[in-house]
Regions:
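Active-site donor/metal-binding and catalytic loop motifs
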Residues: 176-194, 203-207
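Short, well-formed alpha-helical segments that are part of the catalytic scaffolds
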Residues: 12-25
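Non-catalytic, C-terminal membrane-associated alpha-helical segments of glycosyltransferases
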Residues: 195-202, 206-259
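Conserved donor NDP-sugar-binding/catalytic core segment of glycosyltransferases
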Residues: 87-115
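Acidic donor-binding loop at a coil-to-helix junction in glycosyltransferase catalytic cores
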Residues: 156-165
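Glycine-rich, basic loop-to-helix element that forms the pyrophosphate-binding segment
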Residues: 54-70
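A conserved acidic beta->alpha catalytic loop
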Residues: 32-41, 79-82
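Short aromatic/hydrophobic "clamp" motif used to bind/position activated sugar donors
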Residues: 75
Length: 259
């Protein structure tokens, strides 16, 4: 068995079953039932995973609890609605021989024109070599270097952004393998813009808690225009136009929470 625990928070997505089936290595699997539905609970308990339960959804708390009850020295954070491509787990685990953190790539599925635009927009947000999850693997020994905690449970929806800030501040090296990939199902416009709204809420909470790296958005119109020009040149009109609405949703989420 690899010295690795895969931590998967699960709430209401029955695709957890496909996620579990995509695990192609002998590893410890920890499923944290994050205020989960009965259907998701049945899927989890019918597997060979170590099960933890939280009464109400809190992704950061689910990550922390999963890490706490895991028994291996290394953890791999995964989403319940995604699946591993063959070899991904082993690729990320091997990277940990040379560094404390390892990151792979999220591939966003699409079956429609708008789905393709959303997938491209998501790629822009997730292609950087940072400590956002998933797929993110790291050694538990980094704890002391990231201020003594992994994920801030007060920061819903932006807990990995805060984690990345502390990782970067500690000058911890993040190793990256573009071939270590997971597949994310297609997102609808409603789902994606709701996520953007929630990221805005999470960012506002970071500002209210005076977290490093969180800032009050200023010059919103200028920011939208500058982003549009850059993205249009690099990715095309459709993606740039869509991301205007994405940014507006983010700002609305921020405004709702900050007031």
């Amino acid at each position: 068995m690899l010295n690795l625990s895969i931590v998967i928070p699960a709430y209401n997505d029955i695709r957890l079953g496909k996620c579990l089936k995509s695990i192609d290595e002998n590893v410890e699997v920890v499923v944290v039932l994050n205020g989960a539905t009965e259907e998701v609970k049945k899927i989890a308990y019918s597997s060979n995973a170590v099960i933890g339960e939280l009464p109400t959804p809190n992704l950061a708390k689910a990550y922390n609890y999963g890490i706490e009850i895991s028994s291996k020295d290394n953890v791999l954070i995964m989403d319940s609605d995604c699946v591993f491509m063959p070899g991904t787990i082993n690729k990320l685990f091997k990277l940990l021989d040379a560094g404390s953190l390892a990151k792979g790539r999220v591939m966003f599925s699409f079956n429609s024109k708008i789905g393709k635009i959303i997938a491209r927009a998501r790629h822009i947000h997730t292609c950087k070599k940072n400590a956002y999850s998933p797929p993110l693997a790291f050694n538990k020994g980094i704890l002391a270097k990231v201020n003594g905690y992994y994920f801030d449970e007060n920061l819903s929806w932006t807990e990995d952004y805060d984690f990345d800030i502390r990782v970067q501040s500690a000058s911890l090296k993040i190793l990256y393998d573009d071939n270590a990939r997971i597949i994310h199902p297609e997102l609808s416009i409603k789902q994606d813009l709701k996520s953007s709204f929630n990221y805005g809420v999470g960012h506002a909470r970071g500002v209210l808690h005076k977290k490093n790296g969180y800032y009050e958005p200023k010059n919103k119109t200028r920011s939208i225009i500058d982003s549009y020009k850059y993205i249009k040149k690099k990715y095309g009109y459709s993606t740039a136009f869509y991301l205007i609405f994405w940014q507006i949703a983010f700002y609305r989420g921020y405004k709702k929470e900050i007031h």
